[in-house]
Amino acid sequence: MIRKAAMPLPNVTLVLGGARSGKSAHAEGLVEAAAGGGTYLATAEAGDEEMALRIRRHRDRRGPGWTTVEEPLELASALAAHAAPDRPLLIDCLTLWLSNVMAAGRETQRERAGLVAALSAPNGPVVLVSNEVGLGLVPETPLGRAFRDEAGRLNQAVAAVASRVVFVAAGIPLTLKEEERTQ
């Protein structure tokens, strides 16, 4: 069961979890409970039929109170453009964005720093979804290990500026961090 927030959203909320953990549904529930919907900033690209189906399912799950913006790379700019005090911004997901950044040959440290700077003073509440990829086996390939390491660094950097951090396992949200900073 996904529990919905009964309180206003903090400036920045990070929702972490494994694959199919319920993290996206929980993040959507937080925004729904606080504002009845918001702006959904999607970082995924439908590169194949399976991913297109995932994107469609996510979109179908959200109600009419949502606006979708697709931005696979320019996340800090999109955050600045779409965050608003009266309309929460949900970014799903950071690890897909990171894979896009790495595939494009961009400097991950610079991109991460730009995102963290944008999150340090958002124009409205922001909820970010990210995969926790460091709990499994050590990846077999150098690229896989580099991705796992960069995802860990990204999650740590975002968690450091977030007022709330939630880990979702088996559909159950566990609050890891909660500070008293709301919009």
Give the label of every model feature segment.
Residues I2, L9, T13-A81:
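Conserved P-loop
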Residues A5-P10, A84-P85, A113:
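Catalytic phosphate/metal-binding cores of nucleic-acid and nucleotide-processing enzymes, i.e., regions
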Residues A27, H58, L90, N131, ...:
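Residue-level signal for inorganic ion chemistry
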Residues A35, R61-G63, A84, A121-N123, ...:
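Short, well-ordered coil/turn elements that cap or connect secondary structure elements
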Residues G38, L89, R164-F167:
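Short, well-ordered beta-strand core segments
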Residues R61-R110:
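Helix-adjacent hinge/juxtasegments
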